[in-house]
């Protein structure tokens, strides 16, 4: 697969050849679905909790005597059917939301996501980001040159590049990640995927 490499002025500087086994595979919807569900489930904290009737304060005394009042018999004002009472079968914090996915399935989902972006021409390869200092204005100018301004964009660099991160952090809809943290959800959640040439080669080296 041949792709153009652009500079930050939006000009083509060369063409690179990418491995079809990574960037041009038939998308596998089930693998993508399973991987995204697993990734999102792993983010859940599982901290929600409700109190049972045993944990709610008060309610030890019988509200009224068993017989003779004409009312229905009651044993506690903290029974589940009372306002302010305990909750029956409520959520507890010991729930494990983890969903495991086979390594090969995750790899297939990753390659499928990259292939979708490439086939839709939403993958942009740049030679490098050459910032002398953090500059939001300069990053906006670069995005206009690459014709990706006003679009939800994921920028991938080989390493954590502080100047790129700081330059893009105040731009709405732009997220920056190092190649090692690239994931299926973020790829598909963005409209445009922008990668440095080094980052693209690093990703290909892992999944080819």
Curated annotation (Swiss-Prot):
Name the segments for region: Disordered: 44-85
Q: Which UniProt keywords apply?
A: Ribonucleoprotein, Ribosomal protein, RNA-binding, rRNA-binding
Q: Where are the transmembrane segments?
A: none
Q: Does the keyword Transcription apply?
A: no
Pfam families tied to this protein: Ribosomal_L4
Comp. bias intervals (Basic residues): 59-70
Q: Which family does it belong to?
A: Belongs to the universal ribosomal protein uL4 family.
Q: What is this protein called?
A: Large ribosomal subunit protein uL4
> Which source organism?
Mesoplasma florum (strain ATCC 33453 / NBRC 100688 / NCTC 11704 / L1)
């Amino acid at each position: 697969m041949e792709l153009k490499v652009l500079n930050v002025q939006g000009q083509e500087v060369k063409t690179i050849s990418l491995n079809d086994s990574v960037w041009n595979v038939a998308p596998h919807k089930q693998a993508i679905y399973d991987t995204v569900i697993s990734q999102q489930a792993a983010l859940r904290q599982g901290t929600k909790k409700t109190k049972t009737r045993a944990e709610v304060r008060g309610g030890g005394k019988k509200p009224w005597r068993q017989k003779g009042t004409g009312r229905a018999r009651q044993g506690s004002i903290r029974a589940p059917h009372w306002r302010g009472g305990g909750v029956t079968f409520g959520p507890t914090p010991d729930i494990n939301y983890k969903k495991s996915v086979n390594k090969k399935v995750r790899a297939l989902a990753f390659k499928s996501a990259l292939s979708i972006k490439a086939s839709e021409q939403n993958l942009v390869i740049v030679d490098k980001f050459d910032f002398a200092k953090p500059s939001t204005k300069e990053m906006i100018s670069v995005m206009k040159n690459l014709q990706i301004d006003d679009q939800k964009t994921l920028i991938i660099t080989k390493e954590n590049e502080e100047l790129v991160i700081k330059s893009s952090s105040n731009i709405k809809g732009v997220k920056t990640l190092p190649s090692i943290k690239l994931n299926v959800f973020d790829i598909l959640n963005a409209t445009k995927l922008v990668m440095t040439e080094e980052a693209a080669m690093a990703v290909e080296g892992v999944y080819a």
